[in-house]
């Protein structure tokens, strides 16, 4: 049986889903809504109790540093702010597990640092699953990394240990047909 925060995904799928917050690489945002309208809409979908909604929305906007943007239409936000709105919707309802898919792709260096800091902070109170193909990005925010290739787990360790493993020497055996002079010439061009 699979459980999420003690909720059985087979017996109680709705409760299990509420225990997960998800930020896809390209968050599906309603660009004709203001930030606050969108977050209120998401809070309603997530069944955040009405009496807690305003406070939760205020808290997640503060956490993601979008409070000043709450009355702006999402269409008028930069990619960085749209990503923050996506992150805010993922943490609404305070789920136990937060899944982030490539949360810093396309952001400028300052935004990357800010989002990394926020992910670290979220990791203090939530289980954060970060999906990325950039090892340095994962190493910057995670204390444990699992590498999955073709649906199979191929490595699971701390960033430091994986870095050591991946920076080890590698040997490559080549069989080359041609003259030594031609091979040397081709290798020098690399």
Which residue stretches match the model-derived regions?
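Conserved catalytic motifs of ABC-family nucleotide-binding domains
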Residues: 94
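ABC transporter nucleotide-binding domain
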Residues: 116-190
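Conserved ABC ATPase "signature" region
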Residues: 40, 44, 51-69
């Amino acid at each position: 049986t699979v459980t999420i925060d003690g909720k059985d995904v087979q017996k109680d799928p709705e409760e299990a889903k509420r225990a997960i917050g998800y930020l896809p690489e390209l968050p599906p945002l309603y660009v004709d809504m203001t930030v606050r309208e969108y977050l209120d809409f998401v809070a309603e979908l997530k069944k955040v109790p009405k009496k807690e909604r305003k406070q939760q929305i205020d808290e997640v906007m503060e956490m993601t540093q979008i409070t000043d943007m709450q009355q702006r239409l999402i269409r008028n936000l930069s990619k960085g702010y749209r990503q923050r709105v996506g992150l805010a919707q993922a943490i609404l309802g305070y789920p136990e597990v937060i899944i982030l898919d490539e949360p810093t792709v396309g952001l400028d260096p300052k935004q990357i640092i800010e989002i990394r800091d926020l992910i670290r902070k979220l990791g203090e109170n939530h289980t954060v699953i970060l999906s990325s193909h950039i090892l340095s990005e994962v190493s910057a925010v995670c204390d444990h990394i699992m590498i999955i290739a073709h649906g199979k787990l191929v490595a699971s360790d701390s960033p430091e240990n994986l870095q050591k493993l991946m920076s080890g020497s590698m040997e490559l055996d080549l069989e080359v047909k041609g003259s030594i002079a031609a091979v040397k010439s081709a290798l020098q061009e690399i």
